[in-house]
Amino acid sequence: TVDYAFKRVFGKNGNESILKDLLESILNIEIKSITIQNPEIPKNMKDGKIGILDVRAELNGDEITEVEMQVQDQHNIDKRSPTYLTKIYSDQLKEGEQYIEVKKVVVINILNFDYYKRNSYHSVARMMFEKSKENEKVDLGYIVEDKYATKDLEMHFIELPKFRKKDPDMSNKLEQWLCLICDEEETTMSYTEEVY
């Protein structure tokens, strides 16, 4: 299946350069170091559920990135993704540790279905402040206000059916990768392994 092939190629130790290239194209950052980690999210004590994502990596020593390939729409990605995000974030802090030690967490959802009513195939969600109500404003002299409550939590949603509807820009690294991912034949994954 596509998600199995995805995990086999991008989540395999020794394939860090392939994963690095994909993540740089999605996150638009330079990755200096990457470590592929165990993608299992520890069991929740209440419901006993274990979450297993396709790929987990630590980037540049200060960011945890999870990638999940969803082939079928289970009508819950708007609940599932934030649950994984906050669980990974909170599980970092052990008793007695300082909050300053908590790393940024990014969850990337590559969806083989349309989910959100948005006109972009790649949507990024962060915790942003809403616009202040006029009667709640206090003149404190801030010319530019903070936009984010925190930059530590981030979700990406890449909806492949939307991407398939556009002419890909083959000079764009992300669109090159999405063309490969959209081609569900095993030969594509084999080719990717050979190239790298």
Positions of predicted regions on the chain:
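Elongated, amphipathic alpha-helical interaction scaffolds
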Residues: 1-196
